[in-house]
Amino acid sequence: GCAMREITKIMKGWEFTGPDGTTTTVDLPHTWNARDGQDGGNDYWRGTCIYRTHFAAPQFNTASHQVWIQFDGVNASAHVVLNGSPVCNHDGGYSTFRANITELLRDENELTVEVDNSKNDRVYPQKADFTFYGGIYRDVSLMVVSKNHFTLDYFGGPGIRITPTVQGTDASVQVTTWHDGEGEVSIELLDAAGNTVATGKGPDITLTIFNAHLWNGVKDPYLYSCKARLVVNGTVEDETTTRFGVRSFKVDPKKGFFLNGKSYPLHGVSRHQDRKGLGNAITREMHDEDMALIKEIGANTIRLAHYQHDQYFYDLCDEVGMVVWAEIPYISEHMPNGRENTISQMKELIIQNYNHPCIVCWGVSNEITISTKDKKDMLDNHRQLNDLCHEMDKTRLTTLACYAMCGPFNRSAHITDMVSWNLYLGWYVPGFILNDLWMGFFHLCFPNRPFGYSEYGAEGMPNLHSTYPHRGDHTEEYQAKYHEYMLRCFKRHPWMWATHVWNMFDFAADARDQGGEPGM
């Protein structure tokens, strides 16, 4: 939030030229695959569609201010044009991007966004068990900001990086800012009640919070905030407020996850961002409802799969104390031409989300060994991503989700700080006991390697029931039996770093036909 910046959303009345070439009027958020991406048959339309809207230039002083446009999520590639001139291109359907449009503005403006979700070999994801809905499915906004402002065009980030470190009962908080134009930076840290707890000046300073109140997971997710102001000749030209949490965590391969020095076993769920009938074009109320349900089942961790989610949802995770695994959609099939895209999506993920206390690890890939031809290039890509994460973020761990069939000795499972497996033992293959054998065997071979379950589950249909449930019957009873076993199994293996059910909610995979339900 910022009083200095004037923000207007551009959500209503866009002209949309769709797959069949006809033009209709739509409001954002919008996807053209809400229906055909959920009805099965693996035939949802992938290609380029055009969104167009007209807007009057906002009031601003051309000598002292600029106008920026921000897109929170356009899947998958966007080509933005204003009044006939190209503004920017963006590859990656899940992250924020911005552009300075001051020079191109007229009194009346025509904004065109060409959105493309067609198959290619450069932009992830291309092969995966979920639908890649095309569209402008998150907010679009205009921002009037002073020429002197915290940086807006560095990988969609906030221009501020906050790194709290617990030191006994206190916390040292390093605040680094970047800005365009001139100005002196002044920093103010506030507690949850809005009282000032520390102040300082400079683009890279370390402040102390005495008797710091820790962000302590679901029990006590306490948040501080940091106000950064850019001051020119005594006038505040730009201001930005960012929430942060003070916490420490570690993973012990023999004892599991620790939060603020105490054992804190992580058991939770994975989440996709789509809804039936709407696809990925969802509302804040739906995010709230998802979180309420996740809290209700007693989860304390969420794997936000398989891509960057809406900022609003990471904020919710901060507020309710969920421990989060955040990841990029480097998935199923390694594409040698896609390396640059994995790097840019990871930079965006980290830079846009660094300040969220909920996030403890960056996931580099998911089931990448399923259909990868060039193993050497794939491993190299993983090493590069792993190094990038450590270089950009000294405070968090790296992880990945491995495909069951790749086995415990696969080299891709030994690059990141931790590893988790997608194992459906007792669902895709018979035998609950296989879970105990898998965990035990891995732990025996690699006692110093943190091990978790990134996916496990059994599909249950609310309309299918049985007194004698068996594997593959899609009954709720079999699903319940499976989860009861798994919870007892995790108790027997308390050293696991985290477990995530696949999935908290139904999601669309147009190629699937599970339990007689095409498309999910």
Descriptions of predicted regions:
Residues 6-19, 42, 46-153, 180-182, ...:
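Accessory beta-strand-rich segments of carbohydrate-active enzymes
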Residues 43-50, 61-65, 219-222, 251, ...:
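Aromatic- and glycine-enriched glycan-recognition loops and surfaces
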Residues 81-87, 190-192, 233, 260:
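Short strand-turn-strand beta-turns centered on an Asx-Gly dipeptide
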Residues 103-108, 176-253:
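Extended acidic/polar, glycine-enriched regions
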Residues 147-181:
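Surface beta-strand/loop "capping" patches
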Residues 153-154, 158-162, 227-296, 315, ...:
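N-terminal carbohydrate-binding accessory modules
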Residues 291-294, 301-520:
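Substrate-binding/catalytic cleft of secreted carbohydrate-active enzymes
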